[in-house]
Amino acid sequence: MSKAFDLVIIGAGSGGLEAGWNAATLYKKRVAVVDVQTVHGPPFFAALGGTCVNVGCVPKKLMVTGAQYMDQLRESAGFGWEFDASTIKANWKTLIAAKNAAVLDINKSYEDMFKDTEGLEFFLGWGALEQKNVVTVREGADPKSKVKERLQAEHIIIATGSWPQMLKIPGIEHCISSNEAFYLEEPPRRVLTVGGGFISVEFAGIFNAYKPVGGKVTLCYRNNPILRGFDYTLRQELTKQLVANGIDIMTNENPSKIELNPDGSKHVTFESGKTLDVDVVMMAIGRLPRTGYLQLQTVGVNLTDKGAIQVDEFSRTNVPNIYAIGDVTGRIMLTPVAINEGASVVDTIFGSKPRKTDHTRVASAVFSIPPIGTCGLTEEEAAKSFEKVAVYLSCFTPLMHNISGSKYKKFVAKIITDHGDGTVVGVHLLGDSSPEIIQAVGICMKLNAKISDFYNTIGVHPTSAEELCSMRTPSHYYIKGEKMETLPDSSL
């Protein structure tokens, strides 16, 4: 016998849980949420809380925080701290155990949420579409596996997230993804992270801090520079600082084959013919929408050419009662975006009028060492979007690094404006506290702040953030897409 619900959600990640909670508490609807695992770890990794909580933002931030102590300990000597450096060692097992405990606490809090919230029910298993109003809960991902439950659904939200992409090359079975990296029993002595995106860059910093004596971290990327899609100035400066921190960066390189050495290490052959022996190869070449087990074809849900579920601005699919949110839509793969989409889509379904998520001016961060904070358009994007663009740029050594021994750690601040009216359309930061600073900047940009609002604001001294209140003169411009050091005519 099937159970009837106002809303069935496939996927218990950040977006799905937000949607379920709001529907049950704000609209008093009967809601079912389906997912394959309740607590973090193998075999399926993404449990209650989704990628972010289990194998993404949360554990990654904890591990990056741990990694930052390496530099802080070294730099403390400049501030008068004296200790025997030979007695200091990093304990990877302690880090992983603490990380696991913190994630488990969050998993348990979500379990309690289901127990304590009237109208909200969790089903353990693989959710798939049988009809446009019927979701099956199976024992496995295989559509032939045993059906545990059939759920009647007036409305359905698909929120199954994304999954690490792996290269299709010989020997890929000898590699791990970021999922497994969170559960390594020992820090790798020699490690190759494949990819130039934020996951690869962040793990390179983690591994570099915790590597055993004599270890080496290498990052390879098929293009140049790393972090495609981010501000070009920041990409270049971050590369310099990663190299200064001891990370090898191989650009315009991509593995073509992975072989297992007799001692268990990996022999990597690159497309250029170069080779490298490492203990661990971690693939971090991107993430793909997780749709394979959903049986979308049974009801004709359309996909994009990249395999994401196709939705409109209100997260509606082409099937009237079926919606999709978060990574599975291939829009902006960020947890706060999925949460906002989850809240918006529930308002659309059960509220008085449709509500959409604003995907513009979304602040985000890369928790590299040093970190990046970014919001809005890059230089290149702004030059294509506006007739006249002004770029304000500052690169300086933060006060602490004048005595920390790390003068190479520059702070970069860039403000990009529509020079027609002075509206700030992009802000990009590199350096300590950039992710914290950019959140406040995002609020300013949401309110359509102008460059004059920034420089007429009195800064907090001495901070790196105050630089945003001091930038009055553009470093260069773009006129109809052409870069110029000065304006050709004062009337512009």
From Swiss-Prot:
Superkingdom of the organism of origin: Eukaryota
Subcellular location: Cytoplasm
Co-factor: note: Binds 1 FAD per subunit.
Catalysed conversion reaction: trypanothione + NADP(+) = trypanothione disulfide + NADPH + H(+)
Binding site for FAD: 35-52
Gene3D superfamilies: 3.30.390.30, FAD/NAD(P)-binding domain
Recorded GO CC terms: cytosol; mitochondrion
Identification of the protein by name: Trypanothione reductase
Species for this entry: Trypanosoma congolense
